[in-house]
């Protein structure tokens, strides 16, 4: 985790000369510390907030100028620059959260940012594999050595079986897996812990990998290691998925697609939405509900292809 107070450098190396800018930057860093230490936000989330707020501070350097007209003008320039609706929505959310915190801490008198309207962002339905495709994909792992093949197969099976995030898989330790109960302990966003079940295919793949692990590993605890023996990272997992997708003929498939696929297949099989929410580690049921739309679309496509009256 990034230490509190980290990253207190100036914007583009120039901010901080003006005392007003220094006050704004200090407030932004205090807010980021609050997000890390009190709210428990992830490093990646806090980096996003910091980036958006420093961008804002380059235009609105003084807390006394943190007003609704100035904020609208700042966002308006982003529109003129052709920024996406997703970027505008994220920047709006960042300044609104900062504003609420600043009011509570007496840095500004009124929460003018609360009146900002966030643009609606159209969420694309995630790419998912069909059940037959998923089976073919799991059987398409390819690697330079037998040990790497066993590792790659275990990674793919576990991602598909559990729907866990890539970052969560990278953080797995040997002690996190209960092989007898076929359960894995995952540390998710905000350091929230959850237990996820997995099936026989993943269990068999893990057993095969663990027989080979000690020949590759140079660290004691990490469940999965890279070619140099250290804990595996997200970039290496991306390469594993890319290589497998190429063999399987599954274009444009990302590691996150396996998470989408797991969730969709659970719902297709009749799993309860809240159970899937818990399994995926979503804080909001609304996030999980997007997979019900995927299942509905798949059902509609199957109907159109198979029903004589479609």
UniProtKB/Swiss-Prot annotation:
The keyword Iron-sulfur does not apply. Residues 22-103 form the Core-binding (CB) domain. CDD domains: INT_XerDC_C. The active site is at 165, 189, 256, 259, 282, 291 (o-(3'-phospho-dna)-tyrosine intermediate). Belongs to the 'phage' integrase family. XerC subfamily. It is found in: Cytoplasm. Pfam families: Phage_int_SAM_1, Phage_integrase. GO terms for molecular function: DNA binding; tyrosine-based site-specific recombinase activity. Gene3D superfamilies: 1.10.150.130, Intergrase catalytic core (1.10.443.10). It comes from Corynebacterium efficiens (strain DSM 44549 / YS-314 / AJ 12310 / JCM 11189 / NBRC 100395). Residues 124-304 form the Tyr recombinase domain. Its main location: cytoplasm. This is Tyrosine recombinase XerC. The keyword Cytoplasm applies. GO terms for biological process: cell division; chromosome segregation; DNA transposition. NCBIfam families: PRK00283.1. Transmembrane segments: none annotated. Site-specific tyrosine recombinase, which acts by catalyzing the cutting and rejoining of the recombining DNA molecules. The XerC-XerD complex is essential to convert dimers of the bacterial chromosome into monomers to permit their segregation at cell division. It also contributes to the segregational stability of plasmids. One of its GO terms (cellular component) is cytoplasm. Forms a cyclic heterotetrameric complex composed of two molecules of XerC and two molecules of XerD. HAMAP family: Recomb_XerC_XerD. Keywords: Cell cycle, Cell division, Chromosome partition, Cytoplasm, DNA integration, DNA recombination, DNA-binding. InterPro entries: CB, DNA_brk_join_enz, Integrase-like_cat_sf, Integrase_catalytic, Integrase_recombinase_N, Integrase_SAM-like_N, Tyrosine_recombinase_XerC/XerD, Tyrosine_recombinase_XerCD.
């Amino acid at each position: 985790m990034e230490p509190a107070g980290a990253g207190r450098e100036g914007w583009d190396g120039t901010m901080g000369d003006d005392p007003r800018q220094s006050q704004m930057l200090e407030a932004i860093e205090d807010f980021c510390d609050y997000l890390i230490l009190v709210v428990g936000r992830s490093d990646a989330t806090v980096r996003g907030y910091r980036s958006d707020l420093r961008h804002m501070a380059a235009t609105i350097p003084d807390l006394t100028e943190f007003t609704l007209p100035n904020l609208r003008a700042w966002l308006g320039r982003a529109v003129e620059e052709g920024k996406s609706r997703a970027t505008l929505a994220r920047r709006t959310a960042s300044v609104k959260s900062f504003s609420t915190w600043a009011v509570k801490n007496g840095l500004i008198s009124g929460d003018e940012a609360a009146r900002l309207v966030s643009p609606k962002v159209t969420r694309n339905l995630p790419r998912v594999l069909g059940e037959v495709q998923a089976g073919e994909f799991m059987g398409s792992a390819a690697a330079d050595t037998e040990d790497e093949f066993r590792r790659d197969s275990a990674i793919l099976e576990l991602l598909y079986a559990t729907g866990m995030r890539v970052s969560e898989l990278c953080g797995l330790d040997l002690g996190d897996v209960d092989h007898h109960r076929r359960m894995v302990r995952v540390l998710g966003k905000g350091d929230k812990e959850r237990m996820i079940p997995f099936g026989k295919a993943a269990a068999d793949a893990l057993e095969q990998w663990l027989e080979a692990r000690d020949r590759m590993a140079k660290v004691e605890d990490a469940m999965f290691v890279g070619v140099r023996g250290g804990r595996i990272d997200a970039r290496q997992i991306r390469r594993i998925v890319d290589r497998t997708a190429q063999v399987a003929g599954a274009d444009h498939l990302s590691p996150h697609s396996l998470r989408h696929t797991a969730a969709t297949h659970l719902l297709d099989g009749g799993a309860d939405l809240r159970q899937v929410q818990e399994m995926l580690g979503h804080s909001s049921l609304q996030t999980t509900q997007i997979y019900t739309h995927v299942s509905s679309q798949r059902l509609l496509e199957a109907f159109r292809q198979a029903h004589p009256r479609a």
